[in-house]
């Protein structure tokens, strides 16, 4: 999928944001992939360590993913500037580290010619599976409409839960939305972890909500012009951009970018 075409006004807003932030358009697109890998990493953490892992930065990062998942739509996201959706670079720190780790690991040849990191196997597997599922989901108009409709419903319900996107009822709704869309497709994404967590309903809901946020990040990445082959042929450029983004993260005040209300 080539970069989706948007209105001149929307593109101008992106150009202005990029100029003011010092981030390039390629780096802006990469942040969507970072969000996908963050969702994959948090899915792994939830499945192996339970909801207790959602403290401090992990909780903040999870929150940012969930909020953004409600603002990424079939035709056009609320913003083409990634940090307008995800808040700030600190909110994506887990994804920055996860994607960089996957890219620098030794690679093995596979039939698909895609890299297979040894150490980051599960996180990488989840990310690749979500990329595949996203394309299938958004090829089905009924699924795309289901997501759009439920996003609006959840946004309304958040008013009754003090805009707490991690409220159990909201997580359950996002989990159901994932099941009703990506969960209906094959091959299904199987999550591996400890039985005590994978049999716990609140943890299951959090995992599925996290997977939905990853599905949405994958869609956002494609909207911005991302594709799987960039992971193979653009690896060096990605690493350079990730390290530049890390420098920007340390230089910028954490509160400089805030999600739109």
Language-model features: locations:
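Leu/Val/Ala/Ile-rich N-terminal alpha-helices, chiefly Sec-type signal peptides and the beginnings
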Residues: 2-98
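Short, solvent-exposed segments of well-ordered alpha helices
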Residues: 20-34, 56, 83, 113-124, ...
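Charged, amphipathic alpha-helical oligomerization/scaffolding segments
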Residues: 31, 35-42, 125, 129, ...
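Structured alpha-helical bundle/scaffold domains in large eukaryotic membrane-trafficking regulators
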Residues: 48-55, 193, 226-233
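Short, mixed-charge aromatic SLiMs
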Residues: 61-72, 153-161, 233-250
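Long amphipathic alpha-helical segments with strong coiled-coil/leucine-zipper propensity
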Residues: 66-165
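Conserved binding-pocket/active-site segment within a compact domain
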Residues: 152-226
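Alpha-helical oligomerization segments
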Residues: 203-261
């Amino acid at each position: 999928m080539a970069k989706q075409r948007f209105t001149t006004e929307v593109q101008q807003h992106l150009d202005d944001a990029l100029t003011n932030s010092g981030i390039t358009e390629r780096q802006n697109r990469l942040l969507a992939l970072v969000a996908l890998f963050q969702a994959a990493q948090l899915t792994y953490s939830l499945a192996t360590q339970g909801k207790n892992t959602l403290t401090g930065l992990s909780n903040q990062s999870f929150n940012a993913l969930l909020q953004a998942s409600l603002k990424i739509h079939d035709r056009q996201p609320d913003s083409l500037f990634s940090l307008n959706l995800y808040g700030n670079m600190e909110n994506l720190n887990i994804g920055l580290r996860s994607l960089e780790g996957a890219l620098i690991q030794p690679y093995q040849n596979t039939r698909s010619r895609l890299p297979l990191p040894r150490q980051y196997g599960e996180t990488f597997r989840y990310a690749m599976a979500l990329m595949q599922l996203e394309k299938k989901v958004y090829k089905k108009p009924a699924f795309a409409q289901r997501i759009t409709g439920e996003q609006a419903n959840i946004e309304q319900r958040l008013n009754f839960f003090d805009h707490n996107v991690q409220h159990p009822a909201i997580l359950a709704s996002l989990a159901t939305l994932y099941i009703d869309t990506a969960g209906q497709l094959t091959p299904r994404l199987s999550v591996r972890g400890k039985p005590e967590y994978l049999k716990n309903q609140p943890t299951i809901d959090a995992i599925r909500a996290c997977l939905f946020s990853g599905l949405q990040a994958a869609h956002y990445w494609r909207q911005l012009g991302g594709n799987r082959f960039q992971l193979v042929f653009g690896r060096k450029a990605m690493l350079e951009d990730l390290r530049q983004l890390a420098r920007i993260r340390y230089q910028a005040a954490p509160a400089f970018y805030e999600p739109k209300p």
